[in-house]
Amino acid sequence: MNELQKRIKSFGYAFQGIAKLIKKEHNAWIHCAAIVLVTLAGFHFGITPTEWCIVTLCFGMVLAAEGFNTAIERLVDLVSPNYHPIAGDVKDIAAGAVLICAIAAGIIGIIVFLPYLLNC
């Protein structure tokens, strides 16, 4: 297998990971629903290219955080199938990181969309 084939195969694994995240994680569904709603709002209000860049970065940040959180939770479950306080802390901290990203994205959404909403 040459280098190009290896790279293509690694992208395939990455896309499988995204599909697993979206198929199996309830919170990822919620984030995807928010992405759809924000995208529709962006088209409706005609946000600027810069604003599209900002909200797209937020989409990626939140979904990536959810992916990291899911991977961490599954790894913790694998190595510590029985309850352990440190394992619980690790999972809580990872979930908290997702919440931080989601709150930041929400604040950015307010900053971007509030002027449009006030001008309706």
Question: Whereabouts are the PLM-identified features?
Answer:
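Short basic (Lys/Arg) and small-residue
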Residues: 90
